[in-house]
Amino acid sequence: MKYLVAHRKAADDPGFPGPNGGAPRLDAVHAAWMVAVLFYVIAAFHAALVLGAPWGALTQGGGGSGPLAASGRIAAAVSCVISVVMANAILARIGRGPLGVRPSRLATVLAWFTMVYAVIAVILNLITRSSAERALGAPVSLVLLGLITW
C-alpha cells in the first residue's frame, strides 16, 4: 500500500522517499501489474456475462443459473467498467497505463477507491449465499486486497 496507494509524488521526483533513487519498489511494481491483470480478467468475466455467458451462479449473489437477466447484465456492464478503471488507476500509481505516465491526484483517489472496493468485495464474497461464488470470488478478492495493500 505504501507505494500503490499512499504516495502522490512522481517516481522521478528526487524528494520521493523510496529506494532506488526515488523509483517505486520492484515488488510494488510487480504487485501493481498483478492487480491490473486480475482486474482485467474480472472485467473480461463481466463482459462475458453482459454478452450472455451462462455464469449467473458465479455472480450477483448466485441468484440465477445460466445467463443473467437484463438488469443483471446492466450491473455486469457497470462492474466491467469499474474493474477497468481500477486496473488503470493502480497502473497509474506506478507511472504506467492509460491514465498517464505520472501519478496524479485522480489516480491516488481512484487507488484508494480500489482498496475500499476490494475490502467490500472480500466481505460480500465471504457472506454470499452462493457457494460457487464464495469458492471463486472470495479467494480472488482476498488476493486482490493483499496485492493492493502490499
Where do the protein language model's features map onto the residues?
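Short, intrinsically disordered terminal tails adjacent to the first/last structured region
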Residues: M1-P19
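Hydrophobic, membrane-facing alpha-helical anchors
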Residues: D27-V37, M86-I94
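Hydrophobic alpha-helical transmembrane segments of polytopic
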Residues: V35-I42, A75-I82, L110-Y117, G137-V140, ...
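Membrane-helix boundary connector in multi-pass membrane proteins
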Residues: I120-G137
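Mid-chain, well-packed structural core segment of small domains
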Residues: I90-L124
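C-terminal TM-helix exit segments that contain a strictly Trp-centered aromatic cap at the helix terminus
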Residues: A43-A53, S83-I90, L124-T128
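Membrane-water interface at the C-terminal end of transmembrane alpha helices
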Residues: L144-W150
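Interfacial loop at the N-terminal end of multi-pass membrane proteins
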Residues: F16-A32, A48-A76, R96-G100
